Amino acid sequence: MNIGQAPEPDYDSVKIDYVGFVDPYAVEGMVVLKADNGKEFHMRAFSGEVAKHITSFGETEGEPAPSIYRMIEEICEQNELTLVKVKIYDSGDVLRANLYFTGKKDLVLRNQRASDAMALGAYYKIPILVRKKLLKEKLEA
C-alpha cells in the first residue's frame, strides 16, 4: 500500500473517545475508539503509563511529552519524515499496528505495538485507522 493511496475498504478512521484505567491503581490502561458511524472498539491490556500520556496529549497545559516521543520527532525531522497515519489490526490474539511515514521517501513500520502506535497517533493528531471487523455497535448499560 502506498502512503497517499485511498483508504482500504476494511478500515475505518476512529477518534479516541475515552481514556481510562481497568484497575484502581492505574496499572492497566484502556481506550474507547469511536468511528464516525458510532461503532466502537474497546482496547485494553496495555500500560497505564501509556494511557496517562494519551490523556496528557489532549491537554493544553499538560506535562511535557515523554522523551521517547521527542526522540521519534527528532529522528523524523532529521530524516525529513512525517508520521501521517496509524493502522491498528489484530494479529492472532494481539493487536498490532503499522506506522506510515512520508517525506523524502515513504516508509512503513510494520507489526508495532498497537498501544504505542495509538499514542503516537494521539501525540501527532493524525488519523488512526482500525480494521472494521474490530468495531462493534455501542452497548447500552
Predicted regions, residues:
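Divalent-cation
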Residues: 2-141
